[in-house]
């Protein structure tokens, strides 16, 4: 089950109480105080685990508390510190307190201290003085800290797929990566985001994210896309997946409507480097002319993608690819326009290299 938002209560441990005791030895009638200090309460940490990409483990487990510190002992023995609570979260988890961002956990194996445990109380040995040789009191341990927090997951991926329902995004990610999403010939087959690792060669790989299809009005809450657009906010490059076979909505209109929804949701998201994939090209006549015309529409002065071992349908590549985005952050031209067929794996092998080259 994919879960990307939960509310939990976290609490650090209470400090253990100090001990009231006196030294007892043979022939010693009144030994001095020797009560030990209480142990500190356990701390609460958040730890990033790369092996998970959902917050589903928090369903049904609302309270997460560290252990209390142990009481102090006799003979000046300090109590044991309470056991820490390690809360494991997927990379990209944000922690909110009262709707304000508190922690943003993105680094693999990152461990962040969230709450410090209460300090253990002092034993009566600390309170001996010239006028008080036999103190009969010790400190209580300090209380721990409790917070109600909301965990929000924003997946971290290199490439984010954007498209209308049934454009073939799920088929594409299943073809070129290790992801195994549900695939069917109807809209909204994808109900949750999917992550897949794309292996290009023995040394190179990148992470791809597929979110549920976007419909018009998604930025205003229609359909499923708005709930998951946040999952492509962290991606480095967007890939617009357009259905070249649609008769009711051309590729230019598909692109314009998708971009409009992104701009409404987040201008920063809409300004990310991007490329365009013309899917289902194997059932379209004159796909090369369609791709050339689309490049003109995008004002893309492109060169053919002959170096990537393409199938009969050629793609088009922005000259110098990523350097233009690095040197001109306001550049809006596409990095590539590539006809392909996810179903028949046409040009999908070349796509891996194109996407790898497109990454900053």
Curated annotation (Swiss-Prot):
This is GTPase Obg. The keyword GTP-binding applies. Monomer. It comes from Helicobacter pylori (strain Shi470). Its main location: cytoplasm. Its EC number is 3.6.5.-. GO terms for molecular function: GTP binding; GTPase activity; magnesium ion binding. Residues 157-360 form the OBG-type G domain.
């Amino acid at each position: 089950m994919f879960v990307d938002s939960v509310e939990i209560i976290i609490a650090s441990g209470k400090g253990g109480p100090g001990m009231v005791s006196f030294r007892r030895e043979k022939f010693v009638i009144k030994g001095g105080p020797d009560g030990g200090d209480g142990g500190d309460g356990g701390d609460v940490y958040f730890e990033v685990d790369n092996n998970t990409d959902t917050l589903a483990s928090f369903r049904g487990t609302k309270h997460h508390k560290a252990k209390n510190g142990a009481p102090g002992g006799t003979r000046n023995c300090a109590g044991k510190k309470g056991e820490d609570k390690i809360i494991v979260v997927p990379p990209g988890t944000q922690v909110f307190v009262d709707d304000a961002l508190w922690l943003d956990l993105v680094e693999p194996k990152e461990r962040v201290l969230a709450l410090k445990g209460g300090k253990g109380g002092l034993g009566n040995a600390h309170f001996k003085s010239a006028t008080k040789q036999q103190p009969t009191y010790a400190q209580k341990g300090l209380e721990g800290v409790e917070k109600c927090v909301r965990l929000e997951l924003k997946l971290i991926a290199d490439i984010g797929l954007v498209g209308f329902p049934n454009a073939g995004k799920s088929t594409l990610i299943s073809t070129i990566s290790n992801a195994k999403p549900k695939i069917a010939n109807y809209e909204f087959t994808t109900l949750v985001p999917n992550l897949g690792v794309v292996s290009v060669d023995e040394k190179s790989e990148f992470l791809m994210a597929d979110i549920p299809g976007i419909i018009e009005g998604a930025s205003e809450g229609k359909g499923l896309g708005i709930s998951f657009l946040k999952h492509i906010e962290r991606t480095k490059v967007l890939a617009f997946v357009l259905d070249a076979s649609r008769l009711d909505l051309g590729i230019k209109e598909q692109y314009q409507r998708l971009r409009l929804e992104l701009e409404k949701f987040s201008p920063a998201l809409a300004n990310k480097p991007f490329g365009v994939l013309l899917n289902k090209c194997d059932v379209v006549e004159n796909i090369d002319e369609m791709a050339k015309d689309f490049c003109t529409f995008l004002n893309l002065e492109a060169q053919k993608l002959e170096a990537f071992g393409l199938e009969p349908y050629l793609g088009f590549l922005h000259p110098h690819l990523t350097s233009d985005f690095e040197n001109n952050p306001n550049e809006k031209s596409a990095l590539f326009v590539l006809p392909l067929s996810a179903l028949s794996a046409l040009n999908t092998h070349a796509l891996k290299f194109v996407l790898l080259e497109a990454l900053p």
